[in-house]
């Protein structure tokens, strides 16, 4: 049995977001992190590994520098990693990305007892589409918004978050799950894990490795094969600075009334 976890390197949106003159994100000038929801998916896989001894494989699609993120996943406890990277894959939207990742997972083999895990969504797009699209292309049953996961043999029980509560679903493996932050608290890398990470396999899968898969076609991958594209990204205008009024209730009310009167609001 193995668990394949799809992770993504994303811009750290907690810092300043840089935008190019053409409206696209200037990713080169921004710090990158592992997508937070993907970290929860990885932690869920590692917990099952701790309990069962299964193998955990991490996969990402991205440029060569994303290998550093994969090393971090290996340091956390994953057993092997695959970087799916090629110029032909550049500019892919969620549809094209899911085509490529599904082909990569098909190459690795998704067998009877296996589970595929993804984060709910990536913070750079917030679409929550890639995981379900991979499941559709690989003909896997899927459960999204997993807040609790229990595996018993070839059956997985998932507590799925809804807008106003939860529902419990049972599914047979192989299956795909998307995970949310409420699922767990990701572990930290250990010093020993960092050293061990460089002894674990990290393999690059390029276009030549995947081109024979029926999902890989020039019309369905990369920028040209993407039905959607980002027209423009922009930072919203900065809001006005807030004002703090100090004093007792009567005093602050008088100050506020004076300010509103000066602005002809009252």
Show which residues each predicted segment covers.
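N-terminal glycine-rich FAD/FM-binding segment characteristic of electron-transfer flavoproteins
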Residues: 1-266
């Amino acid at each position: 049995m193995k668990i394949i976890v799809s992770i993504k390197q994303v811009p750290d949106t907690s810092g300043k977001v840089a935008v190019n003159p053409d409206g696209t994100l200037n990713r080169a000038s921004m710090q990158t992190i592992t997508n937070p929801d993907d970290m929860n998916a990885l932690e869920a896989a590692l917990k099952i590994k701790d309990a069962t001894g299964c193998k955990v494989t991490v996969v990402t699609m991205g440029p060569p520098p994303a290998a550093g993120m994969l090393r971090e996943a290996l340091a956390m406890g994953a057993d092997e990693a695959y970087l799916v990277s090629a110029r032909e894959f550049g500019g892919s939207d969620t549809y094209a990305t899911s085509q490529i990742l599904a082909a990569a997972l098909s190459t690795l083999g998704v067998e009877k007892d296996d589970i595929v895990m993804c984060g709910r969504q990536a913070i750079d797009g917030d679409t929550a589409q890639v995981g379900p699209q991979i499941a559709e292309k690989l003909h896997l049953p899927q459960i999204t918004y997993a807040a609790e996961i229990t595996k018993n043999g070839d059956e997985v029980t998932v507590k799925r978050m809804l807008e106003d509560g939860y529902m419990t679903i049972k599914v047979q493996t192989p299956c795909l799950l998307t995970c949310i932050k409420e699922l767990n608290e990701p572990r930290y890398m250990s010093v020993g894990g960092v050293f061990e990470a460089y002894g674990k396999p990290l393999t690059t899968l390029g276009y030549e490795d995947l081109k024979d898969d029926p999902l890989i076609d020039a019309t369905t991958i990369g920028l040209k094969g993407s039905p959607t594209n980002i027209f423009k990204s922009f930072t919203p205008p900065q809001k006005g600075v807030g004002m703090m009024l100090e004093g007792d209730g009567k005093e602050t009310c008088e100050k506020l009334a004076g300010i509103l009167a000066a602005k002809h609001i009252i």
